[in-house]
Amino acid sequence: MNKFFFIVSGLFFLNSCGVKKVTNTDFSNSLKKPTEIINSVNSNSNYSKWLSLKGRAKIVQKNQEITVNVNIINRQDSIIWVSAKGPFGIEIIRSQITPDSVFLINRINKKHFTKSVLEARELLKVDFSFYDLQDIITANPKILKKNYTLKSNREFFHLIADSVSYLVTNTYKVQNIKRLTNKNTLEITLEEYLKEDNFPRKINLKVEAGESFEATIEYSKVEFKKPKKILFEIPNLYNEEN
């Protein structure tokens, strides 16, 4: 497992919380402005203090493909914690992100990774913060304020700018995000929202940054507002990944 795969796998697992209110939209008026869409999406966010997710993740990089079971815990504005387990429930990676630091434990190679968020972002060549990641995990992605071209139909709004685009549903949920930074591309898709909690059961991430990387998580269990015990301890015998 190379360094890129080690870092990106952990970051994605790190790679959602509140229940969003569904808004009925009248598409008979096609003269929507980009600012209206942006304000509707960004004001529609609703966070829960705690979010717990369980599911399966498929990760593809180059010719490698792995499928793991994942547990994700998000404590709002504080910690994103993830455990990824392989066959027979054996843990492969445990990771933790705070607003300023990234920690990963690789059980297979008996190594750990500790970097500032800024250092990790530079290594990955992706402009993504703790809060951006939290917004994706909690299904509350924000739309950056830029000059957009707007295309729409009865189901979607499509906001397009030079370096970013958003596909927004008629209930003001962001379904797809594409970002381009220094020829590196990041694409995120949130799908299969359930009516009872208005939360996506499937998230797909694609990264093109010298090497291609794709990960898809399908959630089987979603819990809101239930506090969880978070454990993260680096074994003394593990070496640090530089």
Q: Which sequence ranges carry the predicted segments?
A:
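Positively charged n-region of N-terminal signal peptides that target proteins for export
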Residues: M1-F4
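An acidic-aromatic
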Residues: I80-F130
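Short beta-strand segments
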Residues: I66-V68, E91-I93, F113, N184-I188, ...
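C-terminal low-complexity, charged extensions that often adopt amphipathic alpha-helices
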Residues: L123-S152
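Short acidic, glycine-rich loop/turn motifs
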Residues: A57-N63, A84-G86, N106, R179-N182, ...
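Gly/Pro-enriched, hydrophobic low-complexity segments
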Residues: K20, K146-N242
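C-terminal motif of bacterial Sec signal peptides marking the signal peptidase cleavage site
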Residues: F13-S16
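Start-of-domain marker
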Residues: K21-D100
